[in-house]
């Protein structure tokens, strides 16, 4: 059991951010902070990285929590117009570790890179159905990372398996690291409620184990049909944790 835990810690270290104020949880700020701190002390703390907040939440967070904010690690979701306000909070030593921004033009990416403090990670959300790869090329050239939106609160926001497989291969060709957001609330692909509300619609959602396995396969040169097969998997028992690896069917 200890060996299996070590494998899990190695595979999932810092892999998950806490986005408690976003769907499906939709907590208020205080509830989200409390939940994040509880997770920091929990049995899976090794897998936790940042608490995700919007740029507009920073003023409230700072004034409401005062010095108690220093033990957080924040990832700030912002638009280009928010950059100056975010840097103001950095000057006041807010614990901002990561920055996330949606971009539609290469010039927005270049501006973000120019303004970004040294050593801070930044992820640029790319359209999943990229026809023109200039945006991804610019993210690569300036040394930032990609962000993939894997779903939302309605079925139409979930990219198809074919689109996800193509995007993973496009990112790999560029050596572009990525994070994924939205819709990855379950380990394995399946039909789930989109939110925690009683009247929530249901639909097919991607699984984070599917995405992790597919991305790993792309890294090691897997063919597109093999990548698609992993993204399609709906059986939780298809994955097994051994002393030396996490296995998917016949793959380590």
Residue ranges and their predicted role:
Residues 1-111, 116-122, 132, 219-252:
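Alpha/beta catalytic barrel-like cores
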Residues 142-232:
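Catalytic alpha/beta core domains of metabolic enzymes, predominantly
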Residues 56, 77-81, 102-106, 127-129, ...:
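Active-site beta-loop-alpha junctions enriched in small/polar residues
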Residues 52, 100, 125, 147, ...:
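Residues in well-ordered beta-strands of folded domains
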Residues 106-170:
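Domain-core and long-helix interface of multi-subunit machines
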Residues 39-41, 134, 166, 199:
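Short, flexible coil/linker segments at or flanking structured domains
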């Amino acid at each position: 059991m200890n060996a299996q835990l070590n494998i899990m810690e190695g595979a999932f270290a810092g892999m998950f951010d806490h986005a408690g104020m976003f769907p499906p949880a939709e907590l208020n700020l205080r509830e989200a902070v409390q939940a994040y701190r509880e997770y920091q002390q929990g049995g899976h703390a090794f897998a936790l990285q940042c608490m995700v907040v919007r740029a507009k939440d920073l003023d409230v967070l700072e004034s409401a929590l005062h010095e108690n904010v220093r033990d957080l690690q924040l990832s700030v979701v912002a638009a280009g117009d928010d950059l100056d306000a975010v840097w103001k909070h950095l000057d006041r030593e807010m614990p901002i570790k990561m920055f996330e921004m949606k971009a539609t033009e290469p010039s927005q990416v270049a501006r973000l890179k120019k303004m970004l403090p040294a050593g801070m990670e930044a992820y640029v959300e790319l359209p999943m159905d990229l026809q023109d790869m200039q945006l991804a090329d610019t993210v690569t050239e300036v040394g930032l990372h990609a962000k993939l939106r894997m779903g939302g609160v309605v079925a139409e926001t979930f990219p198809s398996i074919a689109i996800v497989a193509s995007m993973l291969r496009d990112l790999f060709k560029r050596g572009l690291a990525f994070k994924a957001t939205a819709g990855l609330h379950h380990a394995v692909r399946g039909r789930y409620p989109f939110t925690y509300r009683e009247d929530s619609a249901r639909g097919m959602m991607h699984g984070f184990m599917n995405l992790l396995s597919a991305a790993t396969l792309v890294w090691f040169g897997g063919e597109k049909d093999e990548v698609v097969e992993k993204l399609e998997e709906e059986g939780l028992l298809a994955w097994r944790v051994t002393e030396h690896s996490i296995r998917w069917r016949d793959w380590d």
